[in-house]
A protein has these predicted regions:
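Short, charge-patterned binding micro-sites
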Residues: 56-72, 172-185
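C-terminal accessory nucleic-acid interaction domains of nucleic acid-metabolism proteins
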Residues: 1-31, 38, 49, 53-54, ...
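Signature for HUH/AEP ssDNA processing cores
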Residues: 100-173, 184-192, 331
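Short, surface-exposed ligand-recognition loops at beta-strand->loop->(often short) alpha-helix junctions
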Residues: 144-146, 343-351
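Short structural boundary motif marking the start of a folded domain
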Residues: 335-341
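Short beta-strand
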Residues: 59-62, 168-174, 214-218, 376
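Basic, low-complexity intrinsically disordered segments
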Residues: 58, 63-135, 141, 203
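Extracytoplasmic
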Residues: 334-335, 348-383
């Protein structure tokens, strides 16, 4: 008779959990197994739950480790234990799905047994799905940008946040960038939080125009991109303590601001983080004690709009938003071959141009943007 697949029984948070294929290698370069992943999340559960607990989580599964195919799973498996909590989440498409809401170390271990290497929580609590309690500042470097520049932009973010009454909590992304989280009072909608994130991105760009950018289109970016769209509904970001699918099994590490200058993303792995956690505890332990108001950033956004800076492009799978600019990258936009203004109904060209000058006097703001090619004097219409 064929032998049964290998498994191991763990007791986590008072619950019995069967880990299937515990010796399966998930990180070939380091030899880390599924059991190593499960034990990592149990070791840092207090911090990981502060980051991802009580929130709907999208499952990101790597059944054959980081070198195999992975997939995103929004719906919680039907075969889940009865003690796994779920909440029904509605997406921008109008569809709904029951997503997993981890509440204890056992739930994290159960997710890890599904080969969920990463924790991808939504920025809302299961008790209030319409009002995010997290502003996520994603510092995403363009190719070729070094770690020192990323840290410099993080320091600018650190200096900017207090000007708007905000407290920031930095962490490594676990990849190339840094994240800064801000806990929010639960009173703003997703569009408002995204609008605030866009205003912050533009303010950081204004303060450091050679280092940072808020431009959505990759061809327009330079330096470090502040990805404001990570705050749109249905977007998730790898949480603090989340493992990342890198050969060295690094993790997203919560930091104190005093650690930014000397830290390196490679310092934090599933091997080193439990030791750090046991020694220092959670560097974000007080994050929930500092919920902040978005009023300052929303005032800045309103000022931007008065100055002509409206909305910026949304991700491609979102419906076209009111006030959103063209969702076409600049190099593919077709230049109009037609003039913006045609001047007619005058038999003499000088009379037509005089009428045009009167129009410019009445509309000085629009006139300031006109180029010579934008104006056509149509003598035929004046006859």
């Amino acid at each position: 008779m064929p032998s049964k697949p290998e498994s191991e029984v763990l007791t986590v948070a008072g619950r019995e959990l069967i880990v299937s294929n515990p010796r399966k290698v998930f990180f070939p370069e380091r030899g880390y197994t599924k059991l190593d992943v499960v034990e990592y999340y149990v070791a840092v559960a207090d911090g990981a739950l502060r980051a991802a607990g009580g929130r709907p989580n999208m499952l990101v599964r790597y059944p054959n480790g980081i070198d195999g195919e992975y997939f995103y799973q929004k719906r919680a498996p039907d075969s889940r234990p009865g003690w796994i909590e779920v909440v029904s989440l509605q997406f921008p498409s109008g569809r709904t799905a029951d997503e997993v809401v981890p509440r204890d170390a056992a739930a994290l271990a159960w997710m890890a047994n599904l080969a969920c290497l990463e924790l991808h929580p939504h920025p809302v609590r299961a008790e209030d799905l319409d009002h995010p309690d997290e502003l996520r500042v994603d510092l995403d470097p363009v190719p070729g940008v070094g770690w020192e520049q990323i840290r410099e932009v993080a320091r600018i973010v650190q200096a900017t946040l207090p000007d708007f009454g905000l407290v920031g909590w930095p962490k490594t992304s676990g990849s190339r960038g840094l994240h800064v989280y801000v806990r929010l009072e639960r009173k703003w909608t997703f569009p408002e939080v995204r609008r605030a994130a866009l205003a912050l991105a533009r303010e950081v760009e204004r303060r450091a125009p050679t280092l940072a950018t808020s431009k959505w289109w990759k061809e327009e970016r330079h330096g470090v991109f502040l990805d404001y769209n990570q705050n749109a509904k249905d977007r998730t970001v790898a949480a603090a303590y989340s493992i990342r699918p890198k050969p060295d099994a690094r993790v997203s590490a919560p930091l104190g601001w005093d650690e930014i200058a000397d830290c390196d993303p490679q310092d934090f792995t599933i091997e080193t983080m439990p030791r750090r956690f046991a020694k220092l505890g959670d560097r974000h332990a007080d994050i929930d004690r500092h919920p902040c108001s978005l009023a300052g950033l929303l005032d800045l956004s309103a000022r931007h709009e008065r100055e002509g800076l409206g909305d910026a492009p949304w991700p491609p799978h979102y419906k076209k938003q009111k006030g959103e600019p063209a969702r076409v990258q600049p190099s593919r936009r077709r230049a109009s071959v037609h003039p913006l203004i045609e001047i007619g109904r005058a038999q003499v060209k000088a009379d037509a141009l005089a009428g045009f000058e009167r129009w410019k006097t009445r509309h000085p703001e629009a006139a300031a943007h006109l180029e010579p090619a934008d104006v056509l004097v149509d003598a035929m219409r004046g006859r």
